[in-house]
């Protein structure tokens, strides 16, 4: 039996505190084992190890967009089925990378650690449904502080891989369409 091991590794990005994580994976003739989370590996890499207090799983159809949302919680996000185009925007007014945009192709085996205040959004690129898993270090509650930014903000210049029809509620929610631009969010925060 031939075994191949892909080691746990992390990549820094243009947003302070946003990291792309490649899971440890063990492949053989039977299939693959993915080490979804190991606190000691996160700590050894200098990353936030949780604890995770809430897990959400979304099922999202081909071409649909969710986000951009930035709450007062750190998120570890991943795909457990399918693939997505992830988009991240630093909306933290005191961040050294405020306004930076990072995009990541996320497939099974890839995670993104999203610091609190960084907006997270994605578009499903799978032919079928993508399952996107969120791990939160705080429980979401109504009235929780945070911001939303429209994924169609032209100044962000996000190149969504599947064209977005702003009139199609099956592709983009009214709430996300009506969200403010990053410039409006930063102005409201006094920046």
Stretches found by the model and what they are:
Residues 1-106, 127-130, 136-144, 148-191:
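Non-catalytic, conserved peripheral segments adjacent to functional cores
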């Amino acid at each position: 039996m031939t075994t191949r091991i892909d080691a746990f590794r992390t990549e820094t990005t243009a947003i302070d505190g946003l990291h792309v994580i490649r899971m440890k994976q063990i492949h053989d003739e039977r299939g693959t084992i993915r080490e979804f989370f190991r606190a000691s590996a996160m700590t050894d890499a200098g990353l936030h190890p949780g604890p995770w207090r809430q897990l959400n799983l979304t099922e999202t159809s081909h071409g649909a967009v969710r986000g951009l949302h930035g709450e007062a919680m750190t998120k570890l996000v991943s795909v457990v089925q399918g693939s997505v185009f992830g988009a991240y925007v630093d909306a933290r007014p005191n961040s050294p990378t405020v306004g930076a945009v990072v995009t990541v192709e996320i497939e099974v085996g890839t995670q993104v650690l999203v610091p609190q205040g960084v907006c997270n959004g994605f578009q499903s690129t799978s032919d079928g449904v993508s399952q996107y898993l969120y791990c939160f270090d705080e429980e979401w509650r109504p009235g929780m502080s945070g911001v939303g930014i429209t994924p169609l903000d032209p100044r962000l210049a996000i190149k969504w891989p599947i064209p977005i029809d702003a009139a199609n509620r099956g592709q983009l929610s009214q709430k996300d369409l009506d969200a403010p631009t990053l410039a409006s969010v930063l102005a409201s925060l006094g920046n």
